[in-house]
Amino acid sequence: MGLIDYRALLIDCDEVLVDRDSGVWSALQPLLDNAPRAPDRDVVMAGFEAVIGTLYPRFDELGFSGLLCFAHRHLAERLGIRTSWEEGMTFARSVPNWTLFEDAPGAMLYLRKFYRLLVYADRDLQDRGLLCERLGLEPDSLLSLTTHPLDDPQWLAEMDLDPGETLRVSRPPAKALSDGGLCLIRRDRAQHRQPCAADICISSMADLVAQHQLSLRR
């Protein structure tokens, strides 16, 4: 299918619309200031991804803030740094300060003219309203993977979503819906040297808009 043939976009929020990694790295600085030597950013972020992955099955129990608080604690242990639960909660409450990628608001404004837009974003209830406002979304357009898993046909049917007409916009190594399309955003130039492992590969949300405009002219 071509880009203009899809009816809905299912967009991952973090690292597609929101610069989560920069937000996490900035919020980790008070912890890293106590490290015996300055840790490498790639090592720290890989460690963060690892601990988040192990904690994610407890999302319903912990909530997003709790998940981040425990991740802060576990990451500190991996790095051999002493920390407190209070510091962990301060880190967890940094989420509203995570910035949008510069091209995200304009891209969302354009794309909503042509698609139904749904966004995957794990956030606590008190943070969801602000995120919807920043992205120009209705509250029911903000979904969580814990309640709306990609492999569950029930909620897709309830929301009148045909997987075959839905394009997932995510970052590597994401997968598409069962028979839907996949668009991978590769903001890192080093990723561009790799073959595109999706139906569409883009370098930014602005690039997705440009490709859509080009498709309309064909």
Language-model regions, residue ranges each:
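Active-site neighborhood of HAD-like aspartate-dependent phosphohydrolases
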Residues: 1-47, 78
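Asp-based, Mg2+/Mn2+-dependent phosphohydrolase catalytic module
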Residues: 1-7, 109, 120-218
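Generic recognition of short, well-ordered alpha-helical segments
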Residues: 22-26, 102-106, 130, 196
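Catalytic-core regions built around general acid/base machinery
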Residues: 31, 103-114
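Short alpha-helical scaffolding segments that buttress acidic/His motifs in well-ordered protein cores
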Residues: 47-48, 91
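A metal-dependent, Asp-based hydrolase signature
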Residues: 53-89
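Surface-exposed cleft-lining segments at the edges of enzyme active sites
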Residues: 89-98
